[in-house]
């Protein structure tokens, strides 16, 4: 009856006993990739008597009445991820179990830090600083906003060379306008099969080196999309080197179901513990680099953690993943590496930027979700890497989003300092182009949730600085108008503030924001 129940290997497990006030029910939870536990919120009310709640990489628990909080967070991820489970007993937050499933008992565990304090948001900010210092990460995002064009969110996989070149010309024409693009990036469509990244599909007649030169001659960096650790079973690289891939228990390449249409839908994962595979990765990126490409959108990174048999029996999926990332970084040290579907901790030190939300779309539900996911990870901004909020959307065509939805989307670029778009500048309306330009020209630094943010809800008020001056924002993703006092955004209620998104003029004391809309104030 229980023949399918298998014993669990004896991996690293520890527990943190909690001594919180009775009735403590607050928890902040995290996902270790760009997806997010977004509903009802990343802050939850831990109801129940004897039950469990999980979080990846970091967890905060505590009591909102007495402002007593404890944070536990992973500081390193060299061989294993760290998972946290809050265990409740008799309705109390009893203990946190710490699991590192790829660390065996007796092996050196990944480092974990425990912090205590009366401000859970400050604990997360302090935690991010500790991680950055421990991993010797550089300072990110000190210059101007990163701007550019990506084909995906307008054309998706149906993009043609003609589409790209028309948008390249539009971006070049507008470089002297309010939106000056730094990068033009091809996103899918150019390759023959997933995995054969340097093999150009015949539907793209102009060689990629010539396209890249046209981009750079226009004053922009040339960028490209690829999934470096994956190949489809239809690819040339898989057919020529089936021994290069992670294997299942029977010694066959292990297959996962991908999101691409057939015949590209069955994916295998490169075994990056094989030296020849590391050289293959280096060659792929160096070939692109020789063609003039210096911006790489590396997608599907989480698939590079496939469990299975590798050439090095001592490697874990995470340690093998980092070998691959190291090879790529060494191959193109002067290029910008953007991680998508990125396991955050495993990527530290190897990437310049990381997507921190799911894919967006030009509709309200997606923009709301992406907005919340991005501001919920404010503590990562410019500490782990440049946080990429996914593309900002201002366009009126191929869209069901309202102008208010667009302002929320634009705010994700302003808060992170990354403002890539897929909007077609040949068809965008003048007022929408002006709005898009704000995401390129304005950076709200020191961005953080302001006022009260309790369990089971989302904040609406945020504080920060713009050009060294006090700034506040209201991001209303609800179905009702919200009114926010200036002091709840860290602003002086007696001092005029200029509204920057809607051109509302000078305001003071309070501001009311309509449903699914945003305002940005600077004093």
Each language-model region and where it sits:
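Acidic/polar loop patches that form or flank catalytic/metal-binding clefts of enzymes
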Residues: 180, 224, 334-341, 420-434, ...
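Carbohydrate-binding surface patches
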Residues: 412-415, 420, 452-493, 516
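Solvent-exposed beta-hairpin/edge-strand motifs
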Residues: 489-503
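Aromatic-lined carbohydrate-binding/catalytic grooves of carbohydrate-active enzymes
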Residues: 145, 149, 154-286, 295-298, ...
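Glycan-recognition surfaces
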Residues: 239-275, 279, 319, 323-429
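Flexible loop/turn segments at secondary-structure boundaries
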Residues: 155-158, 191-194, 229-234, 303-307, ...
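C-terminal beta-strand-rich structural cap/linker in extracellular carbohydrate-active enzymes
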Residues: 504-523
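N-terminal accessory beta-strand-rich subdomains and adjacent acidic, glycine-rich linkers
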Residues: 1-126
């Amino acid at each position: 009856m229980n023949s399918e129940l298998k014993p669990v290997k004896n991996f690293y497990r520890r527990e943190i006993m909690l001594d919180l006030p009775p009735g403590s029910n607050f928890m902040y939870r995290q996902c270790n990739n760009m997806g997010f536990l977004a509903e009802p919120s990343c802050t939850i009310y831990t109801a129940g008597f004897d039950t469990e709640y999980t979080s990846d990489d970091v967890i905060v628990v505590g009591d909102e009445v007495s402002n007593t909080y404890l944070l536990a967070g992973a500081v390193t991820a060299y061989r294993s991820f760290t998972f946290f489970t809050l265990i409740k007993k008799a309705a109390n937050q009893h203990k946190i179990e710490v699991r590192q499933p790829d660390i065996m008992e007796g092996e050196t565990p990944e480092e974990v830090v425990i912090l205590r304090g009366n401000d859970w948001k400050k604990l997360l900010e302090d935690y991010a600083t500790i991680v950055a210092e421990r991993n010797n990460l550089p300072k990110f995002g000190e210059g101007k906003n990163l701007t550019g064009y990506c084909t995906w969110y307008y054309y998706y996989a149906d993009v043609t060379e003609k589409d790209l070149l028309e948008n390249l010309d539009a971006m070049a024409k507008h470089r002297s306008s309010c939106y000056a693009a730094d990068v033009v990036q091809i996103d899918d469509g150019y390759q023959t099969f997933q995995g054969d990244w340097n093999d150009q599909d015949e539907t793209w007649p102009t060689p990629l080196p010539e396209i890249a030169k046209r981009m750079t001659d226009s004053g922009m960096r040339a960028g490209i999309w690829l999934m470096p650790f994956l190949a489809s079973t239809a690819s040339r690289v898989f057919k020529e080197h089936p021994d290069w891939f992670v294997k299942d228990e029977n010694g066959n390449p292990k297959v996962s179901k991908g999101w691409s249409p057939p015949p590209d839908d069955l994916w295998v994962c490169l075994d990056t513990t094989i030296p020849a595979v590391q050289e293959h990765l280096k060659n792929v990126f160096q070939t692109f680099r020789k063609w003039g490409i210096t911006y790489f959108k590396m997608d599907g990174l989480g698939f590079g953690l496939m469990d299975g048999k590798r050439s090095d029996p001592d490697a874990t999926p995470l340690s093998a993943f980092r070998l691959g990332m190291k090879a790529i970084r060494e191959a193109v040290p002067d290029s910008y590496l953007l991680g998508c579907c990125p396991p955050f901790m495993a990527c530290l030190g190897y990437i310049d930027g990381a997507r921190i939300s799911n894919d967006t779309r030009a509709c309200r539900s997606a923009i709301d979700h992406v907005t919340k996911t991005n501001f919920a990870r404010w503590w990562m901004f410019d500490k782990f890497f440049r946080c990429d909020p996914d593309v900002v959307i201002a366009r009126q065509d191929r869209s069901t989003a309202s102008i208010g939805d667009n302002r929320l989307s634009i705010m994700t670029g302003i808060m992170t300092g990354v403002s890539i778009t897929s909007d077609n500048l040949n068809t965008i309306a003048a007022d929408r182009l002006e709005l898009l330009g704000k995401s390129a020209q304005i950076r709200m630094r020191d961005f953080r949730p302001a006022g009260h943010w309790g369990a089971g809800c989302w904040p609406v008020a945020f504080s920060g600085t713009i050009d060294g001056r006090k700034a506040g924002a209201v991001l209303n993703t609800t179905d009702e108008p919200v009114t926010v006092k200036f002091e709840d955004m860290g602003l002086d209620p007696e001092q005029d503030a200029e509204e920057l998104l809607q051109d509302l003029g000078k305001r003071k004391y309070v501001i009311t924001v309509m449903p699914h809309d945003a305002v940005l104030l600077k004093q």
